[in-house]
Amino acid sequence: MITLENDYIKVSLAAKGAELQGLFSKETKLEYLWNANPKYWAKHSPVLFPIVGSLKNNSFTYQGKSYELPRHGFARDHVFNFEKISETEAVFTLTQNEDTLKGYPFYFELKLRYRLIDRKLNLTYKVINTGTAELLFSIGAHPAFAVPNTPNTVYEDYYLAFNADEKLTFWKLEDGLVSDQTALIELGGHRLNLKHDLFYNDALVFKTLQSNCISLLNNKNDYGLHFHFEDFPFFGIWAATDAPFVCLEPWCGVADDINHDQELTHKEGIIKLDIGENWSRFWEVECF
């Protein structure tokens, strides 16, 4: 376990999956991250790479060959190399290996850079094409935040506040794939009240979100967090059935749709990176 801390926050990181496993505020004395209780969901904040969500039949085709990948890809299950740069920064690195090449025929370098900036935790993803052909990939975040995380509150006391005017149209999932059915969630102002039955039919998948900051707040006190993200064209909100957490998931990529032809080059949201090029995105969370 790797620990980063400053005067305001302390985070715990694991080499397996380069996963964030703890987010503690020294000021509020509160833990903001989900504890990975296996009764509900045994993860905290996995990185989704080189795909987001599920593939149709758990497989794709590329240059005439068929390959298999599990839901959300393989990065979350691999041990990353890491370097602790300072008390407030660490970098994790994963490259292709014999195992990854069986299901994903690309050469890559994936870097996750965690930094503490005052009361904020910043996570920057960087992908480098180290191969001799175009690199195709998707990437996404999946942090789970504890709800409730303060005494004398319950799940229904909490809500998500969006920083832009939203018409929350989401795509319904069908056996983990994006269906052709959408639904509209009515907001009270910029506010989505949390309730467990929001997620009884899997994640809410958004393709047209206007906000770049979502705040997790509650009606009983002033504690909460701001979750900021830039240039992620897809977003998911999810919780396991009746679980005491909510996941805020910015994605560059999305699960296959039910009518997808399984050709990787046709996959919605797939990123195409030229030889030697690099690509990056970040998200950050501020606890209060």
Regions found by a protein language model. Give the residues of each.
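Extended, loop-rich substrate-binding clefts of extracytoplasmic carbohydrate-active enzymes
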Residues: K65-D118
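Short Pro-Gly-centered flexible turn/kink motifs
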Residues: L13, F60-E68, I271-C287
